[in-house]
């Protein structure tokens, strides 16, 4: 299955963000992508780095998500969209998945909150797992990558792929990028699971937009705006993958 992501520099202007999103959807449709993934808060901008939380109203979010739903329906491409989301009087840092008919089929709310996120959002409780064309896909967002427990839940659910929207940017911190890339490699290898990360380009990306295989190797990456297209399959497990899976299951049984 062709799965793509489209990194760009989001900001406070939702119409401008939607312009970039439309470009991504057009490119994905032309390349035959089944699912197109965008970064953390791609629709609204990530507060307070790319915009201010006070400027992200519930009405704007509803308008933007309706536009994204329409894009999915018109293009026939499923879309995973990072956004601020209002629900039940609470505000979340979320990723929503719309199918090719524009229907919401999955929602994940960021669970690991600290600093700005803890001030602006409510922690989520959803598992963020859906299946598309036989491939089981989980979602985790940005700071979640620091917590192995959140990914072990995907292992337990036998997820084939984890999509990770980020807005982790800085002026220029190559050491931080190496550390966070290491986290992604480890989360992929220890859970025998592919990972597709997509990060904002509003500043220096401290996390690569990249596709990691089940052994933690980077298969593809992109550090400028445009489409990163991946042919995601569920390969036969090699000797090392089998060993990690068997032992992880053994340790899980001991925990319970």
Regions from the PLM with identified roles:
Residues 80, 94, 126, 208-209:
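Conserved beta-strand and immediately adjacent loop positions that scaffold enzyme active sites
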Residues 1-4:
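Extreme N-terminal starter segment of soluble prokaryotic enzymes
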């Amino acid at each position: 299955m062709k799965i793509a992501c489209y990194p760009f520099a989001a900001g406070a202007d939702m119409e401008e963000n939607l312009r970039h999103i439309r470009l991504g959807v057009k490119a994905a449709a032309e390349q035959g992508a089944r699912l197109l993934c965008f970064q953390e808060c791609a629709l609204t901008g990530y507060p307070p780095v790319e915009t201010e939380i006070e400027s992200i109203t519930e009405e704007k979010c509803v308008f933007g998500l309706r536009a994204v739903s329409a894009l999915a329906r018109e293009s026939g491409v499923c879309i995973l969209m990072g956004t601020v989301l209002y629900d039940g009087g609470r505000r979340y840092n979320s990723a929503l998945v719309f199918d090719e008919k524009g229907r919401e089929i999955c929602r994940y709310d960021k669970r690991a909150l600290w600093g700005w996120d803890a001030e602006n959002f409510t922690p989520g409780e959803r598992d963020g797992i859906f299946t598309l064309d036989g491939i089981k896909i989980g979602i985790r967002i940005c700071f979640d990558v620091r917590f192995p427990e959140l990914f072990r839940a995907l292992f337990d659910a036998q997820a084939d792929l984890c999509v990770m929207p980020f807005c982790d940017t800085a002026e220029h911190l190559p050491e931080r990028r190496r550390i966070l890339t290491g986290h992604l490699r480890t989360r992929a290898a220890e859970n025998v699971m592919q990972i597709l990360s997509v990060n904002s380009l509003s500043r220096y990306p401290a996390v690569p937009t990249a596709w990691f295989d089940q052994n933690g190797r980077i298969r593809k990456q992109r550090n400028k705006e445009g489409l990163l297209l991946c042919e995601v399959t569920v390969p036969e497990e090699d000797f090392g993958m089998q060993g990690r899976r068997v032992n992880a299951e053994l340790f899980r049984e001991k925990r319970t």
